[in-house]
UniProtKB/Swiss-Prot annotation:
Pfam families linked: DAP_epimerase
Ranges in coiled-coil conformation: none
Enzyme Commission numbers on file: 5.1.1.7
Subunit structure: Homodimer.
Record organism: Alkaliphilus metalliredigens (strain QYMF)
Protein name according to UniProt: Diaminopimelate epimerase
Length: 283
């Protein structure tokens, strides 16, 4: 079976977009994500996004990590999703809503020559309750807790912003450490549904550098929910102000923390290529 697709990226975090109508076999979405996202045997991407009609928003986004697991939200992905549905004419307004597993998100697109160049997303408010994240903890929140990994002590904080995110503030960022420790914490028994892991370096009151190990995807060049969570907890701890530029390996993202607690993320979304995937699941 042939499936039309478009490949896109948001600051280096790359995704495959397909229409639900072109592949309405929900029982195969998990396996399809594994296949198309494979860097050697598929198209290659961090995740698969499926565009579907919604009864509660302008459009629905179903998101699957490269390991086939479904996720409630993806910050860089939803920017690419917004560009896709706007550029394809599925929505015709610059402010619209997207249904996700973590709720309805409001987005605003900026256009150049009638094509989306950047997207601003209301990521919502951080959830601090360990039971909702979830974290195996009896406290009211899980902030600045100590965790031993391979004989080293790490101070970690975990929040829910669509998906679980664990934040570790470091003096310097070491990619080998990010990959080694990130994988261990992702699968730690503290987190019954696993967790994303963000290593953050405070540059100044308005700038943070972040590297992320994503749950279900591994190391990625960018993570929108991750940088939003980092800024949210950094602001909560008075480490940064309400407006932050986040430096990630794939570029930069702008984060604003509103007085009421909503976190806004703004950044680019770009097309890479489009084509036809020769799927092996459905003949």
């Amino acid at each position: 079976m042939e499936i039309k697709f478009k490949k896109m990226h948001g600051t280096g975090n790359d995704f495959i977009m397909i229409y639900y109508e072109d592949y309405p076999f929900e029982q195969h979405f998990n396996q399809l994500a594994k296949e198309v996202c494979h860097r050697h045997f598929g198209i290659g991407a961090d995740g698969l996004m499926i565009v579907k009609e919604s009864s509660v928003a302008d459009v629905q986004m179903k998101y699957f990590n490269s390991d086939g697991s479904e996720a409630g939200m993806c910050g860089n992905g939803i920017r690419c999703f917004a560009k896709f549905v706007y550029d394809e004419g599925l929505v015709k307004k610059e402010i619209f809503t997207v249904e996700t597993l973590s709720g309805v998100k409001e987005l605003q697109v900026a256009t150049v020559e009638e094509k989306v160049s950047s997207v601003r997303v209301n990521m919502g408010k951080m959830v601090l309750d360990p039971k909702q994240i979830p974290v195996n903890s009896e406290g009211l929140q899980f902030i600045n807790e100590q965790l031993m990994i391979d004989g080293e002590k790490y101070t970690i904080s975990t929040v829910l912003l669509g998906v679980p995110h664990t934040i570790i503030f470091m003096e310097t960022l070491d990619l080998d450490r990010v990959k080694r420790v990130g994988k261990i914490i992702e699968n730690h028994q503290l987190f019954p549904e696993n967790t994303n892991v963000n290593f953050a370096q405070i540059i100044n009151q308005n700038t943070i550098r972040v590297r992320t190990w994503e749950r279900g995807a591994g190391y990625t060049l960018a993570c929108g929910t991750g940088v939003s969570s980092v800024c949210g907890i950094a602001n909560h701890l008075s480490l940064v102000g309400p407006n932050v530029v986040v430096e990630i390996e794939g570029g930069k993202l702008d984060i604003e923390i509103a007085p009421e607690g909503d976190i806004y993320m703004e950044g680019p979304a770009k097309d890479i290529c489009k084509g036809v995937y020769l799927n092996s699941l459905i003949k």
